[in-house]
Amino acid sequence: MSVSAVVVTYNRLPMLKEVIAALQASETPVDNIIVVDNKSNADTQEYLTSLGDQIRYVRLEENIGGAGGFNKGIRYFMEETVYDYVWLMDDDTVPTPTALAELVGSAAKVDNKFGFLSSDVRWTDNSRAKMNLPFPIDRFKKIPLDATEMEQLRNATFVSVMFSREVVDKIGLPVKEFFIWGDDIEYTERAARVYPGYMVPTSRVIHKMAQNVESNVSLDSIDRVPRYFYAFRNRMYFSRNRGFVRFLRAHIRIAYEAAMIFFNGQPKKMLRLKMVLKGVTTGWFFKPKVEFAKNKAKG
């Protein structure tokens, strides 16, 4: 069972070095590390170039966001390698030495019939990372911190998640037009329609975010507010394909988030509301196409 890791990076060199070192220290060897660079600065380029054949370096000509980066990384995995599995992570995701071993072992437990396998994502204080909380099929179930058994999930984030070549061949690539936010949820839900997706609680990674907080348009800093356009547009897009109940629930949730803008004491309320409305209205008509990659393993 062979595994390629895909790391998407943008101007976080110190953290990227830690991620690559952790991958190289994995108790179950990573057969191949693909680093997709969203046109980071010269320091990142020089460092990645200096690694030579320790990695496969894919430098992009422009920053196409996390969604575009993972699209390119998975395409490279499919078209330039013949490895069995692809393991995705951000450039601030530090896997523990046994993280991959637990994913690979769990794949064998289900006879490799899984849509995705995700790790238990923790923050630096060992609490669950709030941006990567697991969502079980049973929406009322909470997975305990000391869980050891695989748990079926609705979806997962790209902070340590593994797919098989077989599944990628069937479902295609992440939607690069998402740019950021929601590409991972849409993609893992697509994968879960092929086989069930699972969380592997014994596979641990550390998501080294500056703060352990969820994204929130009403509370976030002003410099980050414009990116919420993508969040709401993308949520509208995939809610249209989730059935009426989930479509309705998405609209109710978004209406609540918009209302909270006026109850939280943060500045630029109209700018925040503008991003919500612009994202929602654009999302009603947003129809990107799913791309497929050639499968080198098929010849």
What are these regions, as identified by a protein language model?
Residues 98-131:
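Conserved donor NDP-sugar-binding/catalytic core segment of glycosyltransferases
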Residues 244-299:
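Non-catalytic, C-terminal membrane-associated alpha-helical segments of glycosyltransferases
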Residues 22, 35-46, 62, 93-94:
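A conserved acidic beta->alpha catalytic loop
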Residues 161, 167-172, 177-203:
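A short, conserved alpha-helix in the catalytic core of glycosyltransferases
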Residues 21-30:
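Short, acidic, metal-binding catalytic loop of nucleotide-sugar glycosyltransferases
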Residues 60-80:
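Glycine-rich, basic loop-to-helix element that forms the pyrophosphate-binding segment
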Residues 82-92:
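Short beta-strand-to-loop acidic/aromatic patch adjacent to the donor-nucleotide binding site
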Residues 143-163:
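A recurrent flexible, glycine/aromatic-enriched loop bordering the glycosyltransferase active site
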